[in-house]
């Protein structure tokens, strides 16, 4: 069983990134926006791992760990903002977030 070719891995990462970007631009629900951001971050992490595996360097795996930790921080902060938005305005519409400015 061989390794995944670089072109295929980067193509999958690019497709996932584009799907996340479309979800980010199209959806108005903040939960789906957060999910789209997670897909985009995981796509970039996949690109790092594939490139690192191609050149037999551990840098791709190090960047993967960094991206995953950033994604966890982004998810926790995003979910905290989501909860406050829902408690205050009883909606998850991202346009209501502009009203959160004190």
Curated annotation (Swiss-Prot):
The keyword Transport applies. The chain crosses the membrane at residues 6-26, 30-50, 62-82. The gene is nuoK. NDH-1 shuttles electrons from NADH, via FMN and iron-sulfur (Fe-S) centers, to quinones in the respiratory chain. The immediate electron acceptor for the enzyme in this species is believed to be ubiquinone. Couples the redox reaction to proton translocation (for every two electrons transferred, four hydrogen ions are translocated across the cytoplasmic membrane), and thus conserves the redox energy in a proton gradient. It is a multi-pass membrane protein. This is NADH-quinone oxidoreductase subunit K. GO terms for cellular component: NADH dehydrogenase complex; plasma membrane. It comes from the Bacteria. GO terms for molecular function: NADH:ubiquinone reductase (non-electrogenic) activity; quinone binding. Its EC number is 7.1.1.-.
């Amino acid at each position: 069983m061989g390794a995944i070719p670089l072109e295929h891995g980067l193509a999958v990462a690019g497709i996932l990134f584009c799907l996340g970007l479309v979800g980010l631009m199209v959806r108005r629900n903040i939960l789906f926006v957060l999910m789209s951001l997670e897909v985009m971050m995981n796509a970039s992490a996949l690109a790092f791992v594939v490139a690192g595996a191609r050149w037999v360097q551990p840098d791709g795996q190090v960047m993967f760990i960094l991206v995953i930790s950033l994604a966890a921080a982004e998810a926790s902060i995003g979910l905290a903002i989501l909860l406050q938005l829902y408690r205050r305005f009883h909606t998850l519409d991202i346009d209501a977030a502009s009203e959160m400015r004190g």
